[in-house]
């Protein structure tokens, strides 16, 4: 029954969501939705066949994926929560991060986040990169005048050729300030 069942999580504004194991890795879910929470942590890998929808979480609290996130579509609503993708990711369709809290892409140099259709992150209040962001020949736009990019690892990579698989690549736009976290180490 792969891709036929959905899970919607609503802990209200006072309750946290904690998933300590994998979700959808044995048989993928159709959709995972976080309707509301006072923070959500997914410790294991999350796999869906259709989408992951992040509707709302209390402002300045985080929705955190510590395992790999695999989904065709990732949708974030224009709310003030933070989003943390720590375990790598494979997302098929273009992603436009609409949430207005912070965005963290990776927490280790070995993390690889493939946004196969490209990505735009100009609405978050700040973007932190540690690891590799890849696309398969699709554009990447990180930051704007109000959204800085912070490099958290010693080497951060933005690669629109998917490690050479799409030789032509695509444009990379860094629209805001780009800084490291430790002087002379990034």
Model region roles, listed by residue range:
Residues 1-186:
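Extracellular lectin-like interaction modules
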């Amino acid at each position: 029954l792969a891709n036929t069942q959905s899970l919607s999580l609503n802990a209200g504004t006072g309750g946290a969501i904690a998933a300590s194991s994998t979700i959808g890795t044995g048989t993928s879910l159709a959709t995972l939705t976080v309707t509301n929470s006072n923070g959500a942590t997914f410790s294991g890998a999350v796999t869906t066949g259709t989408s992951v929808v992040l509707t709302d979480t209390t402002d300045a609290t985080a929705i955190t994926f510590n395992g790999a996130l695999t989904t065709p579509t990732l949708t974030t609503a224009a709310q003030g929560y933070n989003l943390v993708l720590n375990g790598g990711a494979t997302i098929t369709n273009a992603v436009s991060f609409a949430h207005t809290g912070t965005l963290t892409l990776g927490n280790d140099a070995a993390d690889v986040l493939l946004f196969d259709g490209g990505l735009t992150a100009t609405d978050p209040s700040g973007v932190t990169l540690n690891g590799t962001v890849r696309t398969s020949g699709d554009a990447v736009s990180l930051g704007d005048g109000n959204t800085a990019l912070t490099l958290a690892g010693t080497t951060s990579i933005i690669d629109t050729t998917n490690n050479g698989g799409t030789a032509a690549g695509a444009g990379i736009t860094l629209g805001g300030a780009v800084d490291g976290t430790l002087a002379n180490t990034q």
